[in-house]
Structure formats: C-alpha cells, structure tokens
Amino acid sequence: MNGAARTWGVVLAAGEGTRLASLTRDLAGNAVPKQFCSLNGGSSLLQDAIQRARQVVTPERTCAIVAKQHARHWRKALCSLPEENIIVQPQNRGTAHGVLLCVLSILERDPFARIIFLPADHFVLDESALQRSLRELATSLAHNPDGITLIGIAPDEPDPELGYIVPGRTLSDGSRTVARFVEKPAAPVADELVEKKALWNSFIFGATGPALLALLRLQLGTAVDEMATALAREVREADPAALAELYERLPSVDFSRSVVQQFPSRLRVITAPACGWTDLGTPRRVAETVRRLIEQAPTPTPARCRLRPWTSHGLINLAAQHARLSLAG
C-alpha cells in the first residue's frame, strides 16, 4: 500500500465556539457552535472543511470528530460520511484528548495511518492555494515519521490569540525545522515574534499515527492506555459507557500548549502561500473577513442580502448577524 493510500483526514469539529456566541444565537436564544454556521450565506464551515479534506484524502478516509451534545447539528451535516468515520467525543476535555481519540480510532483500522488534521472553523479565500500546501503536507509525512508537520501562515498583524511558529533551517523536502513554538503569547511577545518573521500556526497539521501516539503518551500518561482499553471492541460491547466514564475523569489538556509547544525539535513547518486564510475565532475576525470578501467581490452584494440572518438551508449567517449587531449598536 502506498503512502497516499494510508493518509487519513480528520476535521476537528467538537468545539463549543464560545468566543463567537454573540453571533451564533438561534431563534430560541441558544448558541450554535460556529462550525455549524455559514460565514456569508453558503455552506457551513464544517461542510467547507470536509470538502477541503477531500481534496487531499479519499472520502473513505475522511473523518470528523464531533461532540455528543451537538448531535442535532452534525447528524445532517455529516450524512455523507461513513458512520464509522464520525468520531463522537462524550464531552470536551481539550484538544489533546480529542486528537488522542481520533488517533486511537484510526489506528485500530489502519496501524500505519498518516493523519492530517483540519479545524472546522477556518475560512480560506483561495482554496486552490491552500490545497497545494495540503498536498505538500501529505507528501512530507514520509520525511518526518517521528514528528509533527505544521502548516504556517505569514501573519498580517500580531495577534495574541493565535499560536506562532519560528522557522529554522530549510530541509531537503522543502519544509523547515522549528526553532520555537509559542501558543497564544502575550501581546508584546506576539509583536516581537512577528518582527522575527514567525508564522501563525494554522492548526492544520499532520503526522503518522504512531508518532502522534508516542508524543501524546509523553504528555497524557496513563490516559492513553485507559482510552485504548475503553475503545477496544470487547470492552465497547461489554460496557458501552466505558469511554464516557473515562471522560468524566479526564482533565482538560490543550494540544498546542501541552504537546506541540513542548517538542519543537520534533516539528516541521510548511509555509502556505497567500490564500486569504482566517481562523474565525472572534467577531473581529468575522468582520475583517467579510470586509475583504465585499471589497474583492466583482459585483457588490446588496445590503439587504448581507443582512439575512439565515441561509436558505436554515444555517446561521455569521456575516449577517455581525452586520445586524453593528447596526443595532
């Protein structure tokens, strides 16, 4: 089996999106996680991420991790995925445990899997440009079998709410070593990192399943074996609640801070070309992205259309919600 055939894609879609809750209220006043919303009236961010993954991995190896409590949102959105490719997290215990759940689930099916992770809350203006980096990432995993390869983005400005990658020397495959990784630094440190040509961490990354498992074991300890036991077929059949019971005991652990930041020597980075990438984590970033879209549109969108709070498929329109709140304020 060749390397491409063993590459899996996982869309990270289990977050609550609390920082964007002001824009994601449904008619009942409940906050809908942003990945189940549309940026500007089209498909949901989750559906966009699934399509992004399918440009680099086969549909049969495209997975998503979701939260059990969001089932009413993701059941319809993920109807095109095989049921076994929907990895359900009992509750949120941080991205490190979410990544671990994905790795163990995939390695059970493919012990030599290479896995690419893509967040479900990104907007990309030029998808074809990012696809080049995703293909490069998939290829690079053969050259970094024991570490993690990240996709970095040249920053527009200092932003303390993102992670930063300080690249090192260039390697034979075109990727670069990582001299330093800093997750969500203080504002003065973010300023300094941008001056030093650091890259934003897109949180799009890839690694072999065994390499990820080894790094996670160093930081999560016995939780790795406990989760592997809970996921074993015979345990699932005898005690379906075993995984949920384990999650009740797990602490919340952030993958970027507790795993990626701790092992810079095991990291590689690929710099994405200019592609209009945005992490839609805050209302400010939503507003900036919508402004760019309006400026670059060949035909201006009528204001009445931009203010429609729901898409034709019943999704919350983040751009419209932001515009309405701005007018109300």
Locations of the language-model features?
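Conserved N-terminal catalytic core of the sugar/cofactor nucleotidyltransferase
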Residues: 1-14, 19-26, 30-33, 38-131, ...
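Structural motif
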Residues: 9-10, 61-63, 85, 114-116, ...
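Left-handed beta-helix
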Residues: 1-6, 207-329
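Conserved core of the sugar-phosphate nucleotidyltransferase
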Residues: 58, 126-250, 267
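Hydrophobic packing residues within well-ordered alpha-helices of enzyme cores
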Residues: 20, 74-75, 190, 212, ...
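A short acidic, often aromatic-flanked loop/helix-cap motif at beta-alpha or helix-coil junctions
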Residues: 44, 92-97, 157-159, 187-188, ...
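A conserved hydrophobic position in a structured secondary element of the catalytic/binding core
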Residues: 66, 118, 185, 207, ...
